């Protein structure tokens, strides 16, 4: 029984972690609509810096 409770608690923790990771993605989509230019600039800048180094 202790093992079952332990596994159940681990499953709940993993679900919470995955849920937290999934939630920001839709928020980024909403943010992308508002500041898509800023997000694109940051990504392109990061890509340019990589090859230069």
From Swiss-Prot:
Subcellular location field: Cell projection, Cilium, Photoreceptor outer segment; Membrane; Endoplasmic reticulum; Golgi apparatus
Membrane topology summary: Lipid-anchor
Any one GO cellular component localisation term in the record: extracellular region
Region (Disordered): 24-53
Secretion signal, residue range per the UniProt entry: none
GO BP terms: detection of light stimulus involved in visual perception
Residues lipid-modified (S-palmitoyl cysteine): 2
Assembly mode: Interacts with RHO/rhodopsin; the interaction promotes PRCD stability.
The protein's name in its UniProt record: Photoreceptor disk component PRCD
Organism: Mus musculus (Mouse)
